[in-house]
């Protein structure tokens, strides 16, 4: 076969039908800032759907890192990704507490016995997205359904309701109240101090009713569970009582589903008993059920009304509040923009070739110091991978500082990089459509370059 002894273009014909791709695909690695997901922990992703379900959709602040990862996954199916621990990350909670639970490992090692100041639950991962969540606990038969004392009055076309007796101990926001001769369902928006009046979420339509006796109220999520919480078969055979409870997780703000009030998860008839089991042998203890199955919550502590919660079932009379415990999350924070040091710490998760097998590292929108850190401390150390780097956005996007400014600035950026056979520098940024926010974005090219390299490995 002829070969070239000077630079030129060589044209080859290759029959790809005879190529058998290697079983092991070319793995990429990346660290970035995201709205959700585990922090400082390697996560293996296979496609963009995995990326969205684990780290959530991009917004106007965190889109560059998202699309670098997404663009790589458009070509390849193996990406190890680490979310950086940027300053100010906070898990949303109902107690306005500053809490950071970074990952499942962090929870198991430091918080599985409870989270001081966290209330009953905290958001599973840090980020403002958690502020859209609320939870509701129904821990007793009375909280599920009860009869209000005294009488009530409702007027056609009015959203107010008055009571002859104080209902504060029985009625709470979100409760359903059955009104009128047909027991039409109306929802409580708020209960006045003193409990003798309340506001409905919608005006009452029907005949004005004066002095209706003992109206029925129900838990907000009455129709989402099979029955009132009572005693499970597990507790009953061991002499325990009233161990069952229901927990519902809701997208109150609509940030997860675009539907405010959408129910996300239902934990039906879970148990307050620490040793409770289902018929199939799986745990039914509410703490374990939520920690193992929820995508949105970690358990933080037992509510004060859950008497004997966390005890074994034998001989225990478990208790629960007489009205639902429904709380909205707040205080979750995305934090500030990540620093070079925080990105470098995240990239260090790829330093050991014994812990993770990678071939290409994407630098994203990294500055020269971070790109050098990746080359010098990871690629040069491992000697089995390369780093794909893009110049800074200001070097190549709307750079009109002077004639040939883009070329000069790219050269300056290159000269700030370590000279290494493990580094690859591309030409800049791409302008691509963000389908999640209906906008066009400038995104570093290194995700695409790394992706085409991985794809070439697969088909060649």
Show the residue positions of the predicted features.
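A glycine- and small-residue-enriched flexible loop/hinge signal that marks low-structured segments
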Residues: 1-147, 151, 164-460
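Short, structured beta-strand/loop micro-motifs enriched in basic residues and often containing a Trp
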Residues: 156-162
């Amino acid at each position: 076969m002829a070969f070239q002894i000077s630079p030129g273009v060589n044209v080859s014909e290759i029959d790809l039908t005879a190529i058998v791709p290697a079983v092991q695909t070319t793995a990429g690695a990346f660290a970035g800032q995201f709205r959700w997901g585990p922090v400082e922990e390697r996560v293996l992703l296979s496609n963009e759907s995995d990326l969205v379900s684990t780290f959530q959709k991009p917004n106007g602040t965190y889109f560059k890192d998202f699309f670098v990862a997404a663009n790589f996954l458009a070509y390849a199916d193996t990406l190890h990704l680490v979310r950086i621990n940027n300053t100010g990350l906070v898990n949303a909670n109902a107690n306005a507490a500053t809490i950071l639970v970074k990952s499942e490992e962090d929870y198991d090692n430091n918080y599985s016995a409870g989270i001081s100041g966290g209330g009953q639950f905290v958001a599973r991962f840090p980020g403002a997205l958690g502020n859209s969540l609320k939870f509701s606990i129904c821990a007793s038969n009375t909280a599920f359904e009860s009869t209000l004392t005294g009488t009530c009055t409702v007027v056609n076309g009015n959203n107010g309701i008055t009571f002859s007796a104080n209902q504060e101990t029985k009625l709470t926001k979100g409760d359903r109240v059955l009104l009128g001769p047909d027991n039409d369902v109306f929802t409580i928006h708020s209960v006045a101090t003193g409990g003798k009046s309340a506001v409905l979420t919608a005006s009452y339509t029907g005949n004005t009713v004066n002095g209706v006796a003992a109206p029925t109220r129900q838990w907000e999520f009455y129709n989402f569970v099979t029955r009132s919480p009572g005693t499970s078969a597990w507790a009953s055979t061991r002499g325990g009582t009233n161990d069952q409870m229901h927990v519902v997780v809701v997208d109150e703000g609509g940030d997860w589903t675009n539907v405010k009030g959408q129910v996300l998860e239902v934990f039906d008839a879970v148990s307050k008993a620490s040793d409770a089991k289902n018929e199939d042998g799986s745990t039914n203890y509410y703490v374990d059920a939520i920690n193992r199955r929820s995508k949105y919550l970690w358990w933080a502590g037992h509510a004060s009304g859950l008497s004997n919660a966390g005890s074994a079932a034998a001989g225990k009379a478990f208790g629960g509040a007489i009205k639902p415990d429904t709380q909205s999350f707040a205080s979750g924070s995305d934090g500030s923009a990540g620093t070079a040091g925080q990105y470098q710490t995240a990239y260090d998760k790829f330093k050991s070739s014994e812990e993770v097998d990678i071939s290409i590292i994407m630098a994203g929108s990294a500055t020269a110091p971070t790109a050098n850190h990746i080359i010098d401390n990871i690629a040069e150390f491992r000697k089995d991978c390369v780093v794909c780097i893009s110049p800074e956005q200001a070097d190549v996007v709307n750079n009109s500082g002077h004639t040939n400014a883009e070329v000069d600035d790219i050269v300056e950026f290159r000269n700030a990089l370590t000279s290494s056979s493990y580094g690859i520098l591309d030409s800049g940024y791409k302008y691509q459509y963000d389908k999640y926010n209906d906008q066009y974005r400038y995104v570093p090219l290194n995700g695409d370059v790394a992706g085409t390299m991985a794809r070439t490995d697969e088909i060649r």
